[in-house]
């Protein structure tokens, strides 16, 4: 489960980076690579709104996924600690001398 969520987390991070770099800035950034001011079928305002909404959605998914991963990781760590404590207690009980 953690492996799947980690893969999703990395995928969201890459998509988030791409969407942020595609957004228009003062110097047009990487968005100028796609053809500059070619308005074609879709207007620049529509593309800007889509990229803004995509950024918000991806950021929300990224944060939720990060919180879920952190919770699962802490539970897994506490399970491991409790198993180690159990093993140590069993070894301590077995190492005591037997009275005859």
Swiss-Prot record:
Gene Ontology CC: plasma membrane
Pfam families with a match to the protein in the record: SecG (PF03840)
Keyword Mitochondrion among UniProt keywords: no
Main subcellular location of this protein, as a coarse class: membrane
Annotated compartments: Cell membrane
Alphabetically ordered keywords of this record: Cell membrane, Membrane, Protein transport, Translocation, Transmembrane, Transmembrane helix, Transport
Record GO biological process: intracellular protein transmembrane transport; protein secretion; protein transport by the Sec complex
An example Gene Ontology molecular-function term: protein-transporting ATPase activity
TM spans (from-to): 1-21, 54-74
Membrane topology: Multi-pass membrane protein
UniProt key word Transferase: no
Job description of the protein: Involved in protein export. Participates in an early event of protein translocation.
Family: Belongs to the SecG family.
PANTHER family xref list: PROTEIN-EXPORT MEMBRANE PROTEIN SECG (PTHR34182:SF1)
Protein name listed in UniProt: Protein-export membrane protein SecG
Native source species: Rickettsia felis (strain ATCC VR-1525 / URRWXCal2)
């Amino acid at each position: 489960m953690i492996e799947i969520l980690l893969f999703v987390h990395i995928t969201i991070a890459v998509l988030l980076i791409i969407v942020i770099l595609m957004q228009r800035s003062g110097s047009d950034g990487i968005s100028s690579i796609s053809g500059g001011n070619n308005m074609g079928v879709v207007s620049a305002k529509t593309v800007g709104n889509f990229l803004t909404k995509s950024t918000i959605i991806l950021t929300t998914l990224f944060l939720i996924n990060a919180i879920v991963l952190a919770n699962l990781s802490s539970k897994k760590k506490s399970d491991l600690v409790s198993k180690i404590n159990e093993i140590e207690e069993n070894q301590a009980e077995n190492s005591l001398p037997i009275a005859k």
